[in-house]
Amino acid sequence: MNPYNVTGPSNSQVAQVESIVSQRLKGSFLWMVVGLLTTIGVGVAALANPSWLRFAYQNFNIILLVELGVVFLFSARAYTANVMTLKGMFFLYSALNGLTLTLISLRYNVFEVVIPALIGTLAFFIGFAIVGATTKRNLSSLTPYVMAALLGMIIVSFVMIGARYFNWAVLSGFSDTVSLVLGYVGVVVFSIFTAIDVNRIKNNVTQVALLEDETILDRIEIIGALSLYLDFINLFLSLLRIFGNKR
């Protein structure tokens, strides 16, 4: 007997929420894959057109700054811009990333470094995505720790860039070791971020599923797609560091 006459969600509501969560989670993954295919497509086009590669090489730092600007703008307008604008920014970022990633990948042997790094990325990403999707825990409590680790990685990276630029011999001698350590830390950080982001998408959709507001759900879907895309790309770059450092 329930003295307060309070009832939980009905079985049909639970089933409806689970269906919507599954649909929207798949939607985020689908948009992420479309973004990756856009990146690959631009990369292949760049390899087929030397003028594209030359442009990317000559303007590499500018393209990187534009990419950062797009991501910051996306984050700032994530809950105010219309969904089509967010999708446009997502595709723009994916396309620009095709140019920069192609240049980075060309530094490495395809069969000894790039392909093993890609296979490793798929394994880590899929494994931790499954963890994020199936766990009953809210993984957001892990965010401060991985953010702190990410901040540490960024600071160390800038210090090493400064060491090369100003020719600090003391630090420059450790560049390969630091790069390898950053690679391993990056794999851990972005694997955990993958689980956190999948878990966040699932929880966010669960909270608003019964509102039947397609705009909110579409927004959660594309925001989640960018997060997953960034996790995948950064995992790949981290594994490139590791495999590339060992060759």
Predicted ranges, named:
Residues 1-247:
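A hydrophobic alpha-helical transmembrane-helix feature that marks the membrane cores
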